[in-house]
Amino acid sequence: DYAASVNANLFVSIHLNSGGGHGAEVYYPNSNYRSDIGSEGKTLAQSVQDELIALGIYSRGIKIRNSQDSKYPDGSTQDYYAVIQRSKRAGFPGIIIEHAFIDSTNDFSAFLNSDEKLERLGKADATGILKYLGIGKGEWKQENNGWRYQYTSGEFAINKWEYIDGFWYFFDGNGYRQT
């Protein structure tokens, strides 16, 4: 409810797993009721999972978990996890990131036993989220009419100020640098 009250675009719940396994997994919304949110959630989950796997964590995959008895307003099977179903009802994807198993000696020693290792997990999460949102480092493109800045999403900075590499730049309605 809080995420919806502040007009969130997504909800991310950070967890450590336990129970005798190893590796990372990310839960995302099912495709029932608001399939668009299920699709967006799947893309977000995969983006985060890809970054975690790049750290060397075993991939348990991206997953959905359906409720055994609850239904969405359209009568379809509801998501099991409350943060995912409430995010979906509010109109944005919610995911649960299970980083590693705290009761796995290997996961603990490789990914959880220092601030530096925990920071790497956090940065992987952030990078995956930024890539999903199309935010992040882009690159300058020189064209006949001047310079443009292209984001990693492929879109250009248009009609806005942008802070890039320590400097502010303004881009006109066609995406050309003015300052």
Locations of the language-model features?
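Extracellular adhesion/carbohydrate-binding repeat motifs centered on closely spaced tryptophans
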Residues: 136-179
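Active-site-proximal helix/loop segments of hydrolytic enzymes
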Residues: 1-136
